[in-house]
A protein has these predicted regions:
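Juxtamembrane intracellular "pre-TM" segments in multi-pass secondary transporters
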Residues: 1-16, 192-229, 412-419
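C-terminal membrane-cytosol helix-exit motif in multi-pass small-molecule transporters
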Residues: 160, 180-199, 394-398
């Protein structure tokens, strides 16, 4: 690899260029629509904000178990096939949004997209595990985080321009553009060259099969349980920061957007370089570090009401940097740990089982935060700090029992693709 690429912590892209392009196109498309999804259904479709939020929530809740089925599907037909099919389904879903006129139709179409999203987010890590060498997987996952941050930022900027200049037509244009982005991503992923898959029968080992094997892997289950807490912590930039900053600390409304911009910019600029620095350390120790960084940022938030109001903007900006550091450390190792912990024949099931931790975190975070906030302003951050310390203990307990390659980065291997 050239020196600049090595310093930046980039993998050798090589024949995986279609995958990298697909990821950034996917992210740009998502950035076009996600920030304006509720507003689209309100202004362009005519639903109330309550109906739009209810429809999207119902569809996402119904789709929660999807990762389990996705894991089986990925193991049977391969992650590339699943990734292509789910992007095609997303195209159909977003074009279907143009035909939505009531709550029932919204739930039906949103369910197709929610299921497709969860299928894709099981297939994508498994696909990286299939085409990338063991020593390069951390870098590939770091690159996907950075590309997604860049793409979401670009998409959000373009979406704001489209809506402000085109009005209702702009909202429809966002939906069509997102559908086109998924179509392009499907074509690019279909063109990706991956090693020929060995037959499952030929690689099967004695012992529990299917999801029973995942459940029997107790150290891995400790990681999954700990990641529920990490997942809740990762949602706080959207779920907790804006409400706490504006309603509790009296910060100006524009600060929430600025803090999220700082968060996104740091992910885009620093994620891959940080992954390179983490390669010489155990992945489990990096997870423990992320727990401590998150805990530190939440303690600072808990005591923020004691500060003078004029110091809040600078203070929250500094806390956001610390919080983002925790996110980057966690994101830099967690997916590679899951892939390396999984036997090749059960990779999809391991990723699917692990993705339930994200589903649980996303479901729990809003209610947990608002309930605790209603009791006492600092209680959400105190409770999360305690949970993070428990998660740290869980990771520490799992560390000596995890597979060696799940804990250690095999940096002796080239940071490129399998052939």
């Amino acid at each position: 690899m050239n020196a600049p690429g090595e310093r930046l912590g980039l993998p050798q892209i090589g024949k995986a260029r279609p995958f990298a392009l697909a990821m950034i196109i996917d992210a740009v498309g998502s950035g076009l629509f996600l920030p304006f999804s509720l507003l689209y259904f309100h202004y362009a479709v005519g639903l109330s904000l309550t109906e739009a939020g209810l429809g999207l929530t119902i569809s996402m809740l119904i789709a929660v178990p999807t990762p389990l089925a996705a894991g089986v599907l990925v193991d049977r037909v391969g992650p590339r096939t699943v990734a292509v099919a789910t992007n095609a389904a997303r195209v159909a879903g977003f074009l279907g949004y143009l035909l939505v006129h009531d709550l029932t139709a919204l739930i039906a179409v949103a369910l197709l997209i929610s299921v497709s999203d969860r299928l894709f987010w099981v297939a994508q890590p498994a696909l990286i595990g299939e085409f990338a060498t063991s020593g390069s997987r951390d870098r590939w996952f770091g690159l996907t985080v950075a590309l997604r941050a860049v793409g979401l930022g670009i998409g959000g900027l373009l979406a704001g321009l489209a809506v402000s200049s085109l009005g209702i037509v702009g909202y429809h244009a966002l939906v069509v553009a997102n559908a086109v982005s998924f179509a392009l991503a499907a074509v690019l992923i279909a063109s990706l060259q991956v090693p020929r898959r060995a037959s499952v029968a030929g690689l099967a080992k004695p012992g529990p099969k299917g999801f029973r094997a995942v459940l029997a892997d107790r150290p891995f289950c400790w990681i999954v349980a700990s990641n529920v807490v990490f997942g809740i912590a990762r949602t706080m930039i959207l779920v907790g920061f804006p409400v706490y900053a504006i309603q509790v600390l009296g910060a100006p409304a524009w600060l929430a957007g600025v803090l999220y911009a700082v968060y996104t910019a740091l992910l885009a600029v620093a994620q891959t370089s940080l992954v390179r620095r983490l390669e010489h350390h155990r992945r489990t120790r990096a997870l423990m570090l992320s727990a401590l960084l998150w805990a530190g940022s939440f303690v600072l938030l808990a005591v923020a009401p004691l500060l003078p109001r004029q110091a809040i903007v600078a203070y929250l900006s500094a806390v956001t940097v610390l919080y983002t550091g925790a996110v980057m450390v966690h994101a830099g190792v967690i997916d590679a740990l899951v892939i390396e912990a999984a036997p090749d024949t059960l990779r999809g099931r391991y990723v699917g089982g692990f993705n339930l931790s994200w589903a649980a975190a996303n479901a729990l975070a809003p209610g947990l935060f608002t309930t605790l906030l209603g009791w006492y302003a600092g209680l959400p951050w105190i409770a999360l700090t305690a949970l993070l310390l428990l998660a740290l203990v869980g990771v520490r307990r799992a560390e000596p029992r995890l597979a060696w390659q799940a804990v250690h980065v095999r940096s002796d291997q080239p940071s490129g693709m399998l052939s």
